[in-house]
Amino acid sequence: MLFSKSLVALVACFLPLIVSATELKLRNAAATNVAADSYIVVYKDIDDSTFESEMFNVHSFLSKRDSTFRGLGHKYKMPKFKGYQIESDMDTVNRISQSPHVAYVDKDVKVSAYDLSVRIGAPWGLDRISHRNGTSPGLEEYTYDSSAGGGTTIYIIDTGVYIEHVEFEGRATFGANFIPGSPDTDEDGHGTHVAGIAAGANFGVASKAKIIAVRVLDANGDGKGSNVLAGMQWAADDAGKKNQTAKSVINMSLGADYSEAFNKATEAIIAKGIVVVAAAGNEDANASGVSPASTVDAITVGATDRNDSRAAFSNWGVALDVFAPGVDILSAWIGGKDANKTISGTSMACPHVAGLAAYFIGLEKNGTSTPSKIATKIKGVATKNVVLHPKNSRDNLAYNDDGY
């Protein structure tokens, strides 16, 4: 009897796959910077049992249809976001998408780190975010509460982190690696630089926060959206297992063409109680066209220079919540335990604000922090009306509320 019920369920599931396929439920059809023949199938808000049945049936169908099928890729299972990555041809994905449980399909967008030019400079950014009225020339003075993000964790979803760097004082660990065949370290430098800005001993905003590296980009700073989503889920699950959700921040100094799957996954993580901070992007374009920057409840960060002018490369628009220093930023680098480098990008602005988020969470005495409260705090205390040429963006410049 149990076998009969299973058989009926299996046949019912495959009806949409057997009939003529109708229009593919593809949301980001215009995206061009994508991984070939790779898709993310996103389901409606179904229960875990139904989702597991869907994956089993799709796997069975594809195994019979294609002898070279190697199985489904990353699986994503979070509240209000369930799906998986699949490598297959458009016709096959079209048929799979006809299941009544499938909400939509996204092309697997390519993701890149947001760094730019290299130049000798100094960590003036810390000085700026702790002073209302500009930097202190020659002083590089950072005024902050000595709690400095203690008791919080910042997940750096990036190229990895060189955790042995002296800037991290043993506070950095390597959490997970989603680049097959790569070592558990940073081969590019971008992730280490970002981590240094967020929580380095000398370069960092929250210098007592823990750092956990989640590698989703390769040695060139590139990767696939499906790997980034897997890294995001790992970070959310890790924070949950440690009962540290309310004390965790995810930094995403990376981006891709707009992807609804990307944004929905980001919203799902925020709904779990984790602050997500995203770089606006470096195309001098509307940030509403990139992900995860366009996610409504993420804290999206644009870049400014020493003169409080929006950086020429920084994306802009209503998706931005706040600006932060992002030009000529000095931080940790790879190649030696005390290596450093000065680079620019919204990738550098983003960890200033991720560090601020951890800093403000650390100041909470009763542990009632939420992503909404932290976002409101960051936008509320930001220095207003000082950013030059914000270009239809909120004129907020990040501030730690402890300087003068």
From Swiss-Prot:
- All copies of the Peptidase S8 domain together span 123-404
Query: From which domain of life does this come?
Result: Eukaryota
Annotated site, Cleavage, chain positions: Y114, D115
Q: Quick one: signal sequence residues?
A: 1-20
Among Pfam families, the record links this protein to: Inhibitor_I9, Peptidase_S8
Glycosylated residues are: N133, N243, N251, N286, N307, N340, N366
Write down the Gene3D superfamilies for this protein, in alphabetical order.
Peptidase S8 propeptide/proteinase inhibitor I9, Peptidase S8/S53 domain
Enumerate the GO terms in the molecular function aspect.
Answer: serine-type endopeptidase activity
Q: Which UniProt keywords apply?
A: Glycoprotein, Hydrolase, Protease, Secreted, Serine protease, Signal
Biological processes per GO annotation? proteolysis
What positions does the domain Inhibitor I9 occupy? 38-112
InterPro entries from the xrefs? PCSK9_ProteinaseK-like (IPR034193), Peptidase_S8/S53_dom (IPR000209), Peptidase_S8/S53_dom_sf (IPR036852), Peptidase_S8_Asp-AS (IPR023827), Peptidase_S8_His-AS (IPR022398), Peptidase_S8_Ser-AS (IPR023828), Peptidase_S8_subtilisin-like (IPR050131), Peptidase_S8_subtilisin-rel (IPR015500)
Q: Which CDD domains does the entry link to?
A: Peptidases_S8_PCSK9_ProteinaseK_like
Where is this protein found?
Answer: Secreted
Enzyme Commission number: 3.4.21.-
- Enzyme active site: D158, H190, S347
> PROSITE patterns of this UniProt entry?
SUBTILASE, SUBTILASE_ASP, SUBTILASE_HIS, SUBTILASE_SER
A GO cellular component term found in this entry reads:
extracellular region
Chain positions listed as propeptide in the UniProt record: 21-114
Q: What does this protein do?
A: Secreted subtilisin-like serine endopeptidase. Mediates the degradation of collagen, the major structural protein in the mammalian host. Degrades the nonhelical regions of collagen that function in the cross-linking of the helical components. May function as virulence factor involved in epidermal wing necrosis observed in white nose syndrome (WNS) in bats.
Instruction: Read off the PANTHER family from this record.
Output: CEREVISIN-RELATED, PEPTIDASE S8
Which family does the record assign? Belongs to the peptidase S8 family.
What name does this protein carry?
Subtilisin-like protease 3
Q: Which organism is it from?
A: Pseudogymnoascus destructans (strain ATCC MYA-4855 / 20631-21)
